[in-house]
Every structure is written in C-alpha cells, then in structure tokens.
Amino acid sequence: MKKTYLLLTVLIAFIQGCKDNNDCNELCFTPPENFQFEIVDKTSGENLFTNGTYNVQDIIVTNVMDNSPVEFTFISENDMNLIQIGSIGFKTEIVNLKVDISGNYIFSFYVDAERKEGCCSYTLYKEISISEAEFELDKQSEVYKILVE
C-alpha cells in the first residue's frame, strides 16, 4: 500500500513538473536598456548642468523623422545630472533623435533596434551611433559622455 502511495505521489509530481506553460511572458521579460547621456565640457570634464552652464528646462529632444518631441527623464539625484531616454527598444524600430540645449544643437542619436519575441523577449541593437559630437562611453555605467566645446 505504501508503494502505491509513493508511486502515485511521484507520478503526480512528474505530471505537474511537465505542465505546459503557454504563457511565455511569465517566464522572463528583459526590458530594453535606458540610454543615458552626460553633457560635459570637453576641456575641463565638468558636467555642464552641475556648473550652471545649462538648465534642465532648456533640453529639447526631437525625433528627426517626424519632428515630434521625445520624452526624456533628467536624473539630478546626487548631482549626476544625466539625460535618460527610456522609450527605445520596446518594439522593432529605427530611432533618429537630435538633442538641443539652450538653443544649441548638441548631438544626434541613432538606434536600429529589433525586438526579439519568445519565451524570453529581449532587444537586439543592430546599430547605436552618436554623430555631430565627440563622446566617450563608460562601459561600466553605460553612460555616454558627450564632450561639448
């Protein structure tokens, strides 16, 4: 009798473990990365928001393809003063943006993103480029440091 209960328990556990889960999104979801930019003086390396050269209210991020404004977040916590764009990569898309601050054209940002679907969705970035400005990428923090003269 004990062997029957043991066999039945093992069989039920096995069947439960092999249950087909058709909802792959519950297994994992990898959101696209946020793109962060620090605007610094090319000579001194000072953050141009921290030193008062630029003001957050004067930032304009524009989609070049249709001239529409693009939402961004300004991270001022602990004097980081970073521009963060978090809307790229939730779908397959090509994004071409320009960033102006205080009426000055600062840089262009281009992304070719492909959203890969499946049990573990993720974004494949085919191309990421910054033009019209010198920059450095901090690979540890993933912050693009835009060098402004």
Question: Would you name each region that the model predicts?
Answer:
Residues 2-6, 13-36:
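Bacterial Sec-dependent N-terminal signal peptides
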